């Protein structure tokens, strides 16, 4: 039997920022107030992520330039990882670099082969201010690195070069959501 509420059950679905929105391309500020507004933001992030069928979502993707992300993401063994991190730090990456398909709720409908390590460790805090360490492998490691990138003002397209980058940018230009 499940203990506690389902993440996002009390949150509201917020509009998603899209590639080109300034908040997506600037480093986010550290969270200093671990109060009810932060808890409400985490609930909103979960609600928005689930509504968009995502596996992770950073606060700046809903217009909040603070260092918070949520996730509900499987690893390569299909083990589910569910949680959030406030003021995350990507403290370790390792294993091998794998080029795999990567998408983003801020570039809807698009994906590109993006290189990421297959192991990652993130430290940070919960909404209650308790320290947390999250370890990921495979797809979940990719998710952790992707969300940490968002909070630094980067999207996966920024990691692409050459032909892959040009191809993705052509797809962005043709996308119905592109301004």
From Swiss-Prot:
Alphabetized UniProt keyword annotations: Hydrolase, Iron, Metal-binding, Protein biosynthesis
Reactions accelerated catalytically: N-terminal N-formyl-L-methionyl-[peptide] + H2O = N-terminal L-methionyl-[peptide] + formate
Keyword set includes Plastid: no
A GO BP entry: translation
Cofactor comment: Binds 1 Fe(2+) ion.
SUPFAM superfamilies named among the record's database cross-references: Peptide deformylase (SSF56420)
Keyword Iron: yes
Gene3D superfamilies: Peptide deformylase
InterPro entries in alphabetical order: Peptide_deformylase (IPR023635), Peptide_deformylase_sf (IPR036821)
Active site positions: 147
Entry binding sites for Fe cation: 104, 146, 150
EC number of this enzyme: 3.5.1.88
GO molecular function, one term: metal ion binding
Names of the cofactor(s): Fe(2+)
One Pfam family recorded for the sequence: Pep_deformylase
Reported function: Removes the formyl group from the N-terminal Met of newly synthesized proteins. Requires at least a dipeptide for an efficient rate of reaction. N-terminal L-methionine is a prerequisite for activity but the enzyme has broad specificity at other positions.
Annotated family: Belongs to the polypeptide deformylase family.
NCBIfam families given in the database record: pept_deformyl (TIGR00079), PRK00150.1-3 (NF001159)
Name listed for the protein in its UniProt record: Peptide deformylase 2
Organism: Streptomyces coelicolor (strain ATCC BAA-471 / A3(2) / M145)
Lineage of the species this protein comes from: Bacteria, Bacillati, Actinomycetota, Actinomycetes, Kitasatosporales
Recorded name of the encoding gene: def2
């Amino acid at each position: 039997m499940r203990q506690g509420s389902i993440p996002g059950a009390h949150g509201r679905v917020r509009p998603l920022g899209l590639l080109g929105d300034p908040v997506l391309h600037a480093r986010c500020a550290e969270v200093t107030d671990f109060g009810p507004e932060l808890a409400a933001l985490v609930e909103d992030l979960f609600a928005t992520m689930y509504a968009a069928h995502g596996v992770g979502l950073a606060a700046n993707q809903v217009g909040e330039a603070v260092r918070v992300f949520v996730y509900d993401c499987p690893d390569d063994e299909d083990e589910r990882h569910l949680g959030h991190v406030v003021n995350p730090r990507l403290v370790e990456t390792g294993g091998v670099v794998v080029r795999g398909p990567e998408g983003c709720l801020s570039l809807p409908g698009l994906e590109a082969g993006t290189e990421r390590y297959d192991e990652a460790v993130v430290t940070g805090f919960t909404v209650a201010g308790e320290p947390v360490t999250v370890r990921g492998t495979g797809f979940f490691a990719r998710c952790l690195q992707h969300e940490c990138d968002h909070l630094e003002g980067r999207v996966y397209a920024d990691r692409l070069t050459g032909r892959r980058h040009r191809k993705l940018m052509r797809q962005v230009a043709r996308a119905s959501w592109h301004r």
